[in-house]
Amino acid sequence: MKSSKNDTFVYRTWVKTLVVYFVMFVMSAVVPITAMFPNLGYPCYFNALVDYGALNLTNYNLAHHLTPTLYLEPPEMFVYITLVFIADCVAFIYYACGEVALIKARKKVSGLTDLSAWVSAVGSPTVLFLAILKLWSIQVFIQVLSYKHVFLSAFVYFLHFLASVLHACACVTRFSPVWVVKAQDNSIPQDTFLWWVVFYLKPVVTNLYLGCLALETLVFSLSVFLALGNSFYFMVGDMVLGAVNLFLILPIFWYILTEVWLASFMRHNFGFYCGMFIASIILILPLVRYEAVFVSAKLHTTVAINVAIIPILCSVAMLIRICRIFKSMRQGTDYVPVSETVELELESEPRPRPSRTPSPGRNRRRSSTSSSSSRSTRRQRPVSTQALVSSVLPMTTDSEEEIFP
């Protein structure tokens, strides 16, 4: 069966968007690599944004000068960029496999809307657009960091973080109800390459994106307070404590969102929790390296306690997720859409009608026709039948309860 014109249009739009995504991926791979080498057009090494040798938590920010606050050092920034690049490489392979799988699966289209359902299962054009926006914004972020514009870099990274949150939600939920997602998954032919891509490769890519989202939450928290600390007359220690507390609060909203909404679409979404553990290690490294600086400012204990709470909350949230997975497996409540047809057997006997007592005036007028109506009533017989009807049936009225020969 041929696909509908609407499905063909969706597929062509998806292919064109996929080409743009591939081009943007190549550019996002080139920009970080070239930015690490001197004499290639970048004025500064973007990883070395903050000089922790001049870190003083008791000072206030200095005008016309970059005041060092808590941020990623070159090793941590390199790890972050590398992990994001690995996730993008796996996503690149996934979408390439998805395109090949869709080309093969087009020969097995059995409905007018199957092709658009398969495109949405692999990754709709909206998901690809958000992925393109992520790749573009991370390039701009690296270029802005090379020029040491901390205010503009914080704004650009806010756009990148927002695109990452929307993209992660779109990968998990497809911005559709649960029953629509189930129907799209059920339309995929079993034991095909498309089946393997959607049900085995896509969860891996989604968890990698969720892990990168946890790291991006850390960078976003540090970028916000780096910009605030260099914009207003604040103490550096307050900015450090504010960055740690923001990174403590933001994941809590994601934990709640996961249990309330995202878990209905994807049970095994542990990528964010793994990313939070890695981000906690990255955050605690400056506290260990520059312990004397934090101790002299009397912030070592406070910052250490707040940083330690982050992996503890992550562990609690992950245990809740694991318990809910086992509970759902025991209950076995995995809902699927109803079949297209149902078999309905009509009742063999009609429903009893309420008796009506005629008035004396009406009895005289209808006396001439009573004998004929009684004979026609005796000729009526209930009929038992089986009908194959659609899953959505109209309500029957009283006049349709009896079937006349």
From Swiss-Prot:
Entry keyword set: Disulfide bond, Glycoprotein, Host endosome, Host Golgi apparatus, Host membrane, Host nucleus, Membrane, Transmembrane, Transmembrane helix, Viral envelope protein, Virion
Quaternary structure note: Interacts (via N-terminus) with gN (via N-terminus). The gM-gN heterodimer forms the gCII complex.
Function noted in UniProt: Envelope glycoprotein important for virion assembly and egress. Plays a role in the correct incorporation of gH-gL into virion membrane. Directs the glycoprotein N (gN) to the host trans-Golgi network.
Topological domains annotated Intravirion: 1-17, 98-121, 171-192, 267, 321-405
Region described as Disordered: spans on this chain: 346-405
GO cellular component, one term: host cell endosome membrane
Biased composition annotated in UniProt, kind: Polar residues: 386-397
Name under which the protein is recorded: Envelope glycoprotein M
One of the Pfam families matching this protein, by short name: Herpes_glycop
Membrane topology: Multi-pass membrane protein
Transmembrane segments: 18-38, 77-97, 122-142, 150-170, 193-215, 246-266, 268-288, 300-320
Domain of life: Viruses
Entry similarity comment: Belongs to the herpesviridae glycoprotein M family.
Organism: Epstein-Barr virus (strain GD1) (HHV-4)
Subcellular location: Virion membrane; Host Golgi apparatus, Host trans-Golgi network; Host endosome membrane; Host nucleus inner membrane
Coiled-coil region list: none
Topological domain spans for side Virion surface: 39-76, 143-149, 216-245, 289-299
UniProt-listed InterPro entries: Herpes_glycop_M
